[in-house]
């Protein structure tokens, strides 16, 4: 089993990153490496989808792919690999002969470049979680979706700090826009949240905790 590298959560080993065969969260190295491969396939897809040439299928794969790589969302290697294959097929249908991006280039980049690209990547993953839930309710924002492709393309390019920093800022702005979209999707679908009293007495379990 190959070793892993993952440092996207705040609980990484030694506060520097999980290596070896298992992460602090329980993720195995084979799954971590498959998630890196999936990310590389998403960069390939972003390159294959030119601006304004998105489709429902490419959007769904972009959102699913990014959402899948968030901490504790999917540790099933088989489903991660299956999704990678679907993304690869979508990219091949659009622009054949292009290779997936090697995400190790990000982890091995100079510290400042690695940090800025990681902020973009992890920001896109978090935003994708909001966008995916809004998408499931039928709400899509073209500006948000276009930025997923733009951001993933930039991760696969040789960019300096002066070019990456504005994209980091834009990632934050898009994240806020996506939170607004999800709020609209939820309130228009389910109504406005209402503060409600709940009992605090201890009952016999088991329980499902919902926050």
Predicted regions and their residues:
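Metallocofactor- and cofactor-centric catalytic cores in central/energy metabolism, strongly enriched
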Residues: 1-211
